[in-house]
Swiss-Prot record:
Superkingdom classification of source: Eukaryota
Organism: Bos taurus
The name this protein goes by in its record: THAP domain-containing protein 3
Gene that this polypeptide is encoded by: THAP3
InterPro entries: THAP3, THAP_Znf
Free-text function comment from the UniProt entry: Component of a THAP1/THAP3-HCFC1-OGT complex that is required for the regulation of the transcriptional activity of RRM1.
């Protein structure tokens, strides 16, 4: 059975032609998150089943994880992008009272009911719930602002570390290995000495091979000129 999106007024179906479109199942293991999904879909008396899915067009880009080749939803992702207006919808606003975006984990959630002025497809007025994420109040009052994050300072407080100071902190290159030498003349001298030593060893090896060949040929000649030396051990073994 082909997959189709469960959102209201959405006709997206699973097709190989649209590979960028993905379908995601409802979070049955998390009841609170499941309620948010069902409210945002905007279908009256809707009960999702185990294989009910919703397409990726109803999620914002920040709801997806940036790791991996597939589109994976984050653990707190909620569908908020819909083409219809007026149904019961739970909208998450990641803005604090000062107008700046805040973190969902650090803020304090408050659910405020609002009566919607629009009508549903069946002609009924329904309430919309808006979830506002607020930051905890500061000691100075509600109007206090959070100071911006300052970079790590160097030895003098109040001054950022300058690029020359950062360069001084970098470790120097060790020079205890032969390949770390920076003097080219020394390397050339070592190379020439090694080549000369290698040539001497080759000559000595060649001379030793010639000596071994001569000794082998002499031994063969002696054994060939005295056949009785090979027969004597055999006679001694028979006696």
């Amino acid at each position: 059975m082909p997959k189709s999106c469960a959102a209201r007024q959405c006709c997206n179906r699973y097709s190989n032609r649209r590979k960028q479109l993905t379908f995601h199942r409802f979070p049955f293991s998390r009841p609170e998150l499941l309620k948010e999904w069902v409210l945002n879909i905007g279908r009256g008396d809707f009960e999702p089943k185990q294989h009910t899915v919703i397409c990726s067009e109803h999620f914002r880009p920040e709801c997806f994880s940036a790791f991996g080749n597939r589109k994976n939803l984050k653990h707190n992702a909620v569908p908020t992008v819909f083409a219809f207006q007026g149904p019961p919808q739970l909208v998450r606003e990641n803005t604090d009272p000062t107008g700046r975006s805040g973190d969902a984990t650090s803020g304090e959630r408050k659910v405020l009911p609002e009566t919607g002025s629009g009508e549903c497809g069946l002609g009924r007025k329904m309430d919309t719930t808006v979830e506002v994420l607020q930051l905890p109040p500061e000691v100075g009052g509600l109007g206090a602002q959070v100071p911006p994050h300052t970079p790590e300072t160097s030895g003098v407080p109040g001054q950022p570390a300058s690029p020359p100071e950062l360069k001084r902190r970098l470790p120097t290159q060790p020079s205890d290995h032969s390949y770390a030498l920076l003097d080219l003349d020394t390397l050339k001298k070592k190379l020439f000495l090694t080549l000369k030593e290698n040539e001497k060893l080759r000559r000595r090896l060649k001379a030793q091979r010639l000596v071994m060949r001569r000794m082998c040929s002499r031994l063969r000649a002696r054994l060939a000129g005295r056949p009785g030396l090979q027969a004597r051990p055999r006679l001694g073994q028979q006696s």
